[in-house]
Amino acid sequence: MTAFFSILFNPLVWLTIVAILAFLTWQNYKKIDKLTVMNTDSVLLALEIPKTNDKSELAAEQLLASLHGILRDPTELKNNNGVQEHLSFEIVSVNGAIRFYVWMPRTLQSFVEGQIYSQYPTVQIYEAKEDYAENLENKHVVYLTEIDLIENEALPIKTFDGFEVDPLAGITGTLAKLDGTNDQIWIQVLARPVADDWHKKSDEWVKKVKSGKKAFKIDWKYILRILEALWTPPEGSENAKKEPSDRDKTRISKAEEKATKLGYQVKIRLAYLGEDEDTARLQIQALTGTFKQFNSTNLNGFKASNSSLDKDKIRDFQSRIFFDDGFILNIQELASIWHLPHTNVETPNIVWASSKTAEPPSKLPIITGDRAHDENISAFGLTNFRGINHQFGMLRRDRSRH
């Protein structure tokens, strides 16, 4: 009986039970969230930009700032079962062609399209006829990996203003090497807007660095050293404060700068689909290598994680599921990774817009909608601008003049 009570009141036993229950709860949450996402009506938009596009990465940053408007306030979240919508910005090489996509819940389609057009007026947007991620025919090898941050998310990665050459060129250059093969590479950058509360975590990190405390990931060895230090008498004055090094001063400055912009929770997924496992590993290694161009010795950077050959995990790509918190990037960092190509990107095989489009002339008699009717206009043609059909023709009163 004594042994039973000793086990019953052992804190390690209860800690283990709590940990197991927490894990099971988390797994259940994942399943519920996954079902919610998979049951959401979504749309995949293909974006084509003219090769003469002169909009820089700054346009993408402004786009992300406006798209941040999908952020729900606490009341809206409560009414929406706590679900905050996210977007997926994608670059894909299929059949040797490099395409740019944006995925979203269908309820956001009109808003997202409008924001894209506002920053890229010459872009052509089409609803994809089929989702590339659903076509796995004859793909025997599927190699998947994720991109994660090396350091604390308070520290920024290298951004586009620090590059002499557009960083997108390095990414698309790797995809272009698939030319002439049936292999595929998918890049999905999932982004969910977050409230400015994340700045508080950044401020806490800055305070720890300024005070000389450890501000990064803590492991068990570090905890043991802390416990050991508690039993060790102090050698100096309790009020002695260590001055931050020049390196820490730079990191503090950059972290504070990062926190001045809007933020997104981000998850980056990479997939290679082909026939040969060795080739798959080499291609993913090359692709993850291009993300290291955003690495900085004193600041933050990217590394590969969660690599897998498990085909079942491709479902996460197909559903664009985003169930955890990912890591935080601000709009400048996110725009450095994903933006529409411009004149400085000379990568072959990018699918550019074949022709420019413009809205109908202001004096042209038009009827908006392909089935609409206007008794004052004799319609004889149909045009499409930004996904909206317009009938055009001649005013009936002018017919007698011709």
PLM-predicted stretches and their roles:
Residues 382-390, 396-397:
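N-terminal pre-P-loop "Q-motif" helix
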Residues 2-372, 378, 393, 400-401:
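Extended, folded cores of ATP/NTP-driven motor/assembly subunits in large transport
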